[in-house]
Amino acid sequence: MAVVRVRAIVALLCLVAALGLAEPLEEEDGVLVLRAANFEQALAAHRHLLVEFYAPWCGHCKALAPEYAKAAAQLKAEGSEIRLAKVDATEEAELAQQFGVRGYPTIKFFRNGDKAAPREYTAGREADDIVSWLKKRTGPAATTLTDAAAAETLVDSSEVVVIGFFKDVTSDAAKEFLLAAESVDDIPFGISSSADVFSKYQLSQDGVVLFKKFDEGRNNFEGDLTKDNLLNFIKSNQLPLVIEFTEQTAPKIFGGEIKTHILLFLPKSVSDYEGKLDNFKTAAGNFKGKILFIFIDSDHSDNQRILEFFGLKKEECPAVRLITLEEEMTKYKPESDDLTADKIKEFCNKFLEGKIKPHLMSQDLPEDWDKQPVKVLVGKNFEEVAFDENKNVFVEFYAPWCGHCKQLAPIWDKLGETYRDHENIVIAKMDSTANEVEAVKIHSFPTLKFFPAGSGRNVIDYNGERTLEGFKKFLESGGQDGAAADDDLEDLETDEETDLEEGDDDEQKIQKDEL
């Protein structure tokens, strides 16, 4: 027994010594700086820990940094036990891999030291969004408001706040309200039975009000008070009628449930800027909850890639485009360049009625498109060349800015030279940022597809080595050696997206934000 006691005492002393020797966690602007060596220490020390995995070169991360620090300072000032931390994922690759980091920034919330299932951060990238989300995750679904002062403080605390007014907070309606509150991550909720609170906000009976610091200022819920109806009400009213696309608003835009977006590309420098924006807002009021109206400053350098994605040039703006962000992104273009409220409403109504065909971009066909070993495809000649029943056509779908495409270019040119005079093999390429075709949807770059001869309109994805020998084996085998099996296609797409995220951050924007 004595030996056992001695060992226990020694173990305890070692533990105490280890804890005593643990270095204080480094901080930058109130944010903990974590590495693999101190990650466990941070989890043990803080019950609620929000961790940003970032890359130093990432533009989105740089934009987030001041807001992230501001959120940390706000929580500290309030005496909160919640801490914010960050990990340089380019330096701590194993740590990033452990938590499934594939893009930047990735933000995860750890509770009670649990590494097994951290929660993905899903709200916006402004300090208020971060603080609001964390309070929702660590506190009650709705704050109990005992008096008018408490209600006013809550309403002033965030851009959007939802308050339930219930004389009996145990009623069925109040329970439905709380269920809705638990389902919404990024909006603070309050609940009150106080006559003082009812009076302040001019309510004489039970109800729900969404308060916001824009547009109408408040929306009163009407109808049968159920969780689903409340969530639909919130979805329809939580965003401005027109929201400007920025680094900060992107998560709200793409993280929401409204997947149909109409975009106004408008330079802020144009003389009638306010008038055109007002027309857009007037039209927006007719489609709340159905179509999200987004304004993009076409003069801003950060938005040039988005213009390219829609096949627009700065001199063509103002312009309107519509996009659906379902499994396949589909773009639509109005028939008229008229940007009056009536024309915009007409365009949206026709879309909702299914009366508009998708808009497919195409460059003009170069006169010498077939004069080089690698043939140039555009939207206008794609069908004719790729689905030629007498030819086997191997196509690279690329983006001019893609680093992996640039690395592939000399190999693809050599492949073109190799089969330059072949009677039925054609090597081709298409700039998929400027050309779209109905038969093929491209999600990452480069994408390589083989269109074998015959009448079947077959398409084979290439998943082999990107070497001259690998390509030759694939072609000589009739598209068999190196072809992606059906169950490999998802992995192939995942790998490509990972490649994209390793490149310049602006290159990621289209893939991550889907614009």
Curated annotation (Swiss-Prot):
Keywords assigned: Cell membrane, Chaperone, Disulfide bond, Endoplasmic reticulum, Isomerase, Membrane, Redox-active center, Repeat, Signal
Disulfide bond annotation, renumbered to this chain: C58-C61, C402-C405
Molecular-function GO terms, alphabetical: protein disulfide isomerase activity
Motif placement: Prevents secretion from ER: 512-515
Biased composition (Acidic residues): 484-507
Residues marked Lowers pKa of C-terminal Cys of second active site (site): R466
Keyword Repeat: yes
Catalytic activity: Catalyzes the rearrangement of -S-S- bonds in proteins
Taxonomy, superkingdom: Eukaryota
Domain Thioredoxin intervals: 23-139, 351-480
EC code(s) of this entry: 5.3.4.1
Membrane topology: Peripheral membrane protein
Oligomeric and partner information: Heterodimer; heterodimerizes with the protein microsomal triglyceride transfer MTTP. Homodimer. Monomers and homotetramers may also occur. Also constitutes the structural subunit of prolyl 4-hydroxylase. Stabilizes this enzyme and retains it in the ER without contributing to the catalytic activity. Binds UBQLN1.
Function: This multifunctional protein catalyzes the formation, breakage and rearrangement of disulfide bonds. At the cell surface, seems to act as a reductase that cleaves disulfide bonds of proteins attached to the cell. May therefore cause structural modifications of exofacial proteins. Inside the cell, seems to form/rearrange disulfide bonds of nascent proteins. At high concentrations, functions as a chaperone that inhibits aggregation of misfolded proteins. At low concentrations, facilitates aggregation (anti-chaperone activity).
Name the record gives this protein: Protein disulfide-isomerase
Gene: P4HB
